[in-house]
């Protein structure tokens, strides 16, 4: 977000109803496709061979290297700035932080798949909270 977007009392331009409609259409369509995408990739032998037991990052390494995001969560560290240092209106939303157990590429992939669904739900919640 650009610094000029946020203004005293709000933002430079509120979300339009057209954009809201486009977002809600996308979320509905994407949410329906998540299972299809997951089935296609998660059950794929080649995908599994290339992701499982590859690119291990353990708990200590994740901290030592200063990783963030899915790299931390894949190593078993439940870190999400939206929950831990609630800024904007994230304190009005309830969601949990998906974490991995092995710290490999497959864990990080599975976290991302889980986040796809959670993001769709969060977008719907945001629209309700913002009363759009």
Residue ranges and their predicted role:
Residues 1-132:
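Active-site bordering "gate/hinge" segments
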């Amino acid at each position: 977000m650009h610094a000029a977007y946020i203004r005293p009392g709000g933002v430079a331009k509120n979300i339009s109803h057209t954009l809201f409609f486009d977002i809600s259409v996308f979320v509905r369509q994407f949410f329906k496709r998540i299972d299809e995408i997951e089935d296609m990739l998660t059950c794929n032998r080649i995908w599994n061979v290339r992701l499982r037991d590859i690119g291990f990052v353990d708990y200590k390494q994740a901290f030592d290297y200063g990783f963030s995001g899915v790299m931390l969560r894949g190593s078993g560290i439940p870190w999400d700035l939206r929950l831990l240092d609630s800024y904007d209106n994230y304190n009005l939303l309830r969601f949990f932080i998906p974490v991995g157990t092995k710290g490999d590429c497959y864990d990080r992939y599975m976290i991302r798949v889980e986040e796809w669904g959670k993001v769709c739900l969060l977008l719907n919640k945001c629209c309700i909270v913002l009363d759009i």
